[in-house]
Amino acid sequence: MNNYFLFPRAFIISLLLPTLAMAALPASEPVPGGIAIIAVGTAAEKAPHVGFQGNRVMVVRELNSWHAIVGLPLALAPGKHALTITTPNGIAHRQSFDVSNKIYEEQRLIISDQRKVDPNPEDLTRINRETAIQKKAFMFWRNEAPDNLIFDMPAQGRFSSAFGLRRFFNDQPRQPHAGLDIAAAEGEPVTAPADGIVIETGNYFFNGNTVLLDHGLGMVSMYNHLSRIDVTPGTQLKRGQVLGLIGKTGRVTGAHLHWTVSLNNARVNPALFLPEEIRARLK
């Protein structure tokens, strides 16, 4: 496994405030696994520091206001929650917001390789090691705003499994589906949906061949089950550049791309970053 954390990072660590004026924001859906977009100050002042559940939150400028783009974990309880906001002059306060309930559908899959459902002790050691690597990647922070918060599709194909599905493998309950699946022929290209820097590549027990991209301000995306990886940690990708090929490595029932988007260390629905006409295909 290769990871960007071993590389010198000074050349990309910017001390500048994220002052990008966004052309568009992602879709706001304040539910578990969704995104809350919350105005947190006027753009006449410098950007505030915003935190949620111990993680720093993306803040971007839209017109004359600063907005927090808050990732909401799938396990988050519905109800009242609060951001911690610290102004540029050091004054801290809390700002509450509401999270609505959402019931995700069930999905039952049959996996032919039983080890991918009930790993042996050696597999579990590997899984724990790989989980730690991915957790570190999802917590990565680069103080530079993304080029755009509306993503392109990372692969051409049909949506085969929606985000948030309550999954059962061989009738055994497992973690919910924390990504969006796009079914396509093996060997078809997978491209960066927005500008990003490769921070991790590797072959994982469940995820197969995997690439993780940092887009800035705590936004990280992940691409799983690739048949081939075409990038290395530190590679700077422009929107539309190929990072690998569709495959069926790891725990799969067929060739597809599993696409994950993480905000402030919370896995959120990637569809919320797609244009409305593409999101409509999921409804």
Residue ranges of model-derived segments:
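Conserved, short, structured surface segments that act as functional micro-motifs
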Residues: T210-D214, M219, T235-K283
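Surface-exposed, glycine-biased beta-strand/turn segments
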Residues: S96-N207
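N-terminal secretory signal peptides that target proteins for export/translocation
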Residues: M1-F7
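Bacterial N-terminal signal peptides
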Residues: R9-T19
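Zn2+-dependent peptidoglycan hydrolase active-site motif and core
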Residues: P193-S227, A255, T260
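Terminal peptide-recognition signature
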Residues: G54, L83, F159, I182, ...
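Short, well-structured beta-strand-loop connectors
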Residues: P189-I199, R228-I246
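Cationic-aromatic interfacial patches
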Residues: A23-S96, N101-I103
